[in-house]
Amino acid sequence: MYEFTGTDGQKALLSAELVDVTAATAEQVAFLNEQFDKDELKGFEISFIHLSQSKVSGDPVEFNSDYTSFKPIDAQGQRVQDVTVIGWDECTTESFTPEFDTGESITQCFIAAAPAGGNAPAGVMYDGGYEDPNPYDYYDGKPLLFVAE
């Protein structure tokens, strides 16, 4: 669990749990390769990381989000390249819905790219985003790690 601070200073206690880390299919990799210029993903293995989130308590946070505060990591907690795609139904992230605000969980999807044979994605870290002060900061704090066992 972690404390989320919204854009207008709202505070809520959120729960997050790693659901899975799965390899992209050949069709998904082909689609992603079509979306990027200059073979940017060539030689990379693509994975999807799914994270379940729910609100435990606190202020209303609907229409806020914190998915940009999660970054792919390997089993040692080191950053892995993330891939951002907007509007792709096969891997979505969303803002907190009114239903989320009343306790319903949502599942976020993150895309990771690792060199073939390199540090395989094993989860995500939460770095607290732009919160100030930020106890979860990647450089000056202690990010929360959600890693597959």
Name these PLM-found stretches.
Residues 1-48, 54-149:
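Conserved functional micro-motifs across diverse proteins
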